[in-house]
Amino acid sequence: RAGWPKFDAGGGRARGEEEGVKDRQRMRVVKQRPVGRDEGSDKSLNREVKGGGQEKQIFRIDICLGRETVQNIKGMRFANTIFEPIWNRNYISSVQITASETVGVEERAGYYETSGALRDMVQNHLTQMLAITAMETPGRFDPEAIRSEKAKVLQAARLADELEPWNCCIRGQYGPGGSDGAPLSGYRQEPGVDPHSTTETYVAMKLFIDNWRWQGVPFYVRTGKRLAKRLSEVVLTFREAPVHLFDAAGGSPTANQLILRIQPDEGAEFKFEVKSPGSGMRSRPVEMEFSYDESFGEPSDEGYVRLLADAMLSDPTLFTRSDEVEAAWRLYTPLLELIEDSPWKLPIHPYESRTWGPAAADALLARDGLLWRRP
């Protein structure tokens, strides 16, 4: 992964031309994310790559789409009548999507300095998790039907404050800290990093999806390096009961939550209220849990294993289509341009290594009376 090479747009086209028409029909182009730097460069690269083949021969790989729990979001929704009828704005009050890492940039400083968390993680991983969580039910379980529904979600997504995006987007950068007594360097002290770098290693933002299902429901996404815990998850928080009939231990009843754990410990949790033992009617929160390993007795496949096998079999279900990628870049390009032209409007907020990120990210949710989940 060190010093990842820049994508050679003409490579696929040139090889296709060299091998002849017959072999070109069998050619597969597998593109690792992120490809391009914004909406314009992505469109240009897509035109170049398609010069050597058709869209059906291009497989844009995103490791998160190969993970069992990401795929299981569709399974839980569309195979169970208890979830899909309440998977909407009438019952869900907010959604949190998190992808946190405990490591720093490691040997990837050369790549990361020109990318940052917004391009490296938000534009692809988190956006795909959002699309799968929010997509409409496809008419059939077919690759193109599924990808079309994801594309519609991304085309309907927007920043919570498009006129003043600094009100809904927080950028951070990890500083020095400690872990089990061992000191950890800050991002600017990493080998290969500009000592005055303004590259973000953390992003948190608030989005809306302007469609019938999700109108008015905030989607909060966050990702960062050198955070307190390694995890990827989707948290759906349900609306509170309109009337509180029972006393709750510690105050008001807690909102029901469905937590989909992508990694580690792949599985799901459902949090709800029950009556506490004893006299009186007091409620307390409890959890039901599903563990992939415990239920199936084997660890799930690594994402790349499944994805590369699917590419060889020409199954595009778990790969992103060009219109999905373009919609994602269209969503974030205004932020990228703002960072480029007026970086002081989206300043870098420092945070200590092995914490949960900058205080400004907590304030983003606090304005809505919410907290980030910290497992």
Question: Model-found features: residue ranges?
Answer:
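Secretory/organelle targeting and membrane-embedding segments
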Residues: 1-30, 35-375
